[in-house]
Swiss-Prot record:
Organism: Actinobacillus succinogenes (strain ATCC 55618 / DSM 22257 / CCUG 43843 / 130Z)
Record keywords, A-Z: Hydrolase
GO molecular function, one term: dGTPase activity
SUPFAM superfamilies linked: HD-domain/PDEase-like (SSF109604)
Gene3D superfamilies recorded: Hypothetical protein af1432
Xref: HAMAP family: dGTPase_type2
UniProt name for this protein: Deoxyguanosinetriphosphate triphosphohydrolase-like protein
One biological process term in Gene Ontology: dGTP catabolic process
NCBIfam families (alphabetical): antiphage_dGTPase, dGTP_triPase, PRK05318.1
Pfam family, one: HD_assoc
Length: 451
């Protein structure tokens, strides 16, 4: 059996011949477009964990993305080793050598996986989840807002590398950035049918009411259809399907499937979130060893033999007074996750980029989830973090209403042109794009000018 990647995945929305004597492969050109974009540069001014932002050590969205790229490249390299094929070899009852010869050519190049990891957060608005909440509430009747959907919109429309196709990346690169291939307003709660506090009442804009679902904007349907054109009808229906059928108006629906490249990028993001964000929080004293006890107990009793054996040493090093010991523990954890990555197959797909994914075994995923849940509980949900995000939430909601009240007077000239050229029902999206593209500091500065 020989699998090959459909040449359509190398196409761009607009024909784009390399310049004279430019011999770079397509994904290296994509990588350069991300690195030189304003959206990527803006990540340096967006904080990864707001509560640690007063410390010089803290990570930004930019440094986080660089670390995700390093982990992603390591995962892709690890998938070339024989042990990564063992589980699938047993499942298919075939030789490892045969499977390796078939699957290795499907793996993303280092240029491609780094491109995806560099770009994966560029759609996140200022003030993290607080910003998402504010913009989703303000866009509730206009398609909603969500960070991953905004990433898709930036690379396919907003970033001014071309007039109308954004960065004009290869189709495979764009596919790798799509974590949730459904339309956002179909995945979101049916807001018009719910009795929720009016979102312009800033005192009652609760995150639990207005946190976004996951998907892509209906406004970008032309690019979505272009992206999925190489898929068979059967593959497209399965790829865009939800995990379950909606049973009530409040439900958040999620898709199940991702491309091979996206699965590698998402694992890298999860590892960086679970391990490196924990490192930040320990160093600045956001979490204590007594708080860690609950996670320690779970790790001590988890199904991973390696973790049960090493959790005491890891804990001692993680909370050591010596930075090199903490770094040693962090390195050991990252290595543990990377070296357990393996191939996974979903036989219902025919396109090989959807049929095969990267995954971690159940016992390793269990460990990663313990780390992620701990970071969420003690770092993301930390009261200082939540107060900063809530402040940002109020700022963005206020700014949106101000800009909407007199857009031709208050928006920048280029944004005004886009607003004037948009259909009436699409004008809110133009305001949303402008606010979502701000850094934390710039949003504060603009709001002060308007207040």
């Amino acid at each position: 059996m020989i699998l090959s990647v459909n040449s359509a995945w190398l196409e761009r929305f607009q024909a784009d011949r390399p310049r004279e004597k430019d011999h770079r492969p397509p994904f290296r050109r994509d990588r350069a477009r991300i690195l030189h974009s304003a959206a990527f540069r803006c990540l340096q001014a967006k904080t990864q964990i707001h509560a640690v932002g007063e410390n010089d050590f803290y990570r930004t969205r930019l440094t986080h993305s660089l670390e995700v790229a390093q982990i992603g490249s390591s995962l892709a390299s690890q998938l070339r080793f024989t042990e990564a094929f063992t589980s699938l070899t047993e499942q298919l009852n075939c030789s490892s050598k045969e499977l390796e010869s078939v699957l290795k050519p499907l793996l993303p190049s280092n240029d491609l996986i780094e491109t995806l990891c560099f770009a994966h957060d560029i759609g996140h608005p200022p003030f993290g989840h607080g910003g998402e909440t504010a913009l989703n509430a303000m866009m509730r009747h206009s398609g909603g807002f969500e960070g991953n959907a905004q990433t898709f919109r930036i690379v396919t429309k907003l970033e001014p590398y071309t007039e109308k196709a954004g960065m004009n990346l290869t189709r495979r690169t764009v596919l790798g950035l799509v974590k949730y291939p459904a339309i956002l307003d179909e995945a979101s709660p049916q807001y018009s049918l719910l009795d929720l506090p009016h979102p312009t009442d800033l005192g009652h804009l609760r995150q639990i009411d207005w946190r976004p679902s996951k998907g892509l904007y209906r406004d970008d349907l032309t690019m979505i259809n272009w992206l999925l054109k190489p898929l068979s009808d059967t593959d497209r229906r399965l790829f865009t399907s939800f995990r379950k059928v909606r049973s009530n108006f409040q439900e958040f629906l999620k898709t199940v499937y991702k491309s091979l490249d996206c699965s590698i990028m998402e694992l890298a993001d999860d590892i960086a979130y679970g391990v490196h964000d924990l490192e930040d929080a320990v160093v600045v004293g956001l979490i204590s060893q007594s708080q860690w006890q609950a996670a320690y107990d779970e790790l001590k009793n988890c199904s991973s033999d390696w973790m049960r054996k090493n959790v005491d040493t890891l804990t001692q090093k993680l909370f050591s007074d010596y930075h090199y010991e903490r770094k040693n523990a962090i390195g050991a954890l990252v290595n543990y996750f990377i070296t357990h990555v393996r191939w996974k197959m979903t036989a219902d797909f025919t396109d090989p980029l959807l049929r095969y994914n990267a995954e971690l075994p159940d016992d390793v995923i269990c460990v990663l989830n313990i780390f992620k849940d701990f970071v969420f509980k003690y770092v993301i949900r930390d009261v200082e973090t939540q107060r900063i995000e809530f402040r940002g939430q109020r700022i963005l909601t206020d700014m949106f209403q101000i800009f909407e009240s007199d857009p031709e007077r208050l928006l920048p000239r280029n944004t005004v042109k886009r607003w004037q050229n948009a259909e009436a029902e699409g004008r809110k999206r133009i305001i949303c794009d402008y606010i979502a593209g701000m850094s934390d500091a710039y949003a504060l500065r603009v709001h002060r000018q308007l207040s």
